[in-house]
């Protein structure tokens, strides 16, 4: 059975964020706290989006009225899964249990 790298996207809501950098830092920190110790093997980083006009990469975070929405990328290696679908279900289950009500979206599954 092969191993897989599963990439998920999550949306993180932050209150009282003064700057974009603060919001991203808080989101990554809070995600890390929730993932540790049950899913400490999950990599967390700030998400990026492609601009539809110029195709440059933009931060997937926005701050309005001291409230932020930050897109995070979560990567997890899944070992000995039966298929890509099985690997994605395992990753969503493990990460979803740790993050509780945070929305998750599957972005990619790669065989290692």
Swiss-Prot record:
UniProt xrefs under InterPro entries: UPF0212 (IPR007564)
Similarity-based family: Belongs to the UPF0212 family.
PANTHER family the UniProt entry points to: UPF0212 PROTEIN MJ0068, UPF0212 PROTEIN TK1194
Protein name, entry field: UPF0212 protein Mboo_1659
Organism in which the protein naturally occurs: Methanoregula boonei (strain DSM 21154 / JCM 14090 / 6A8)
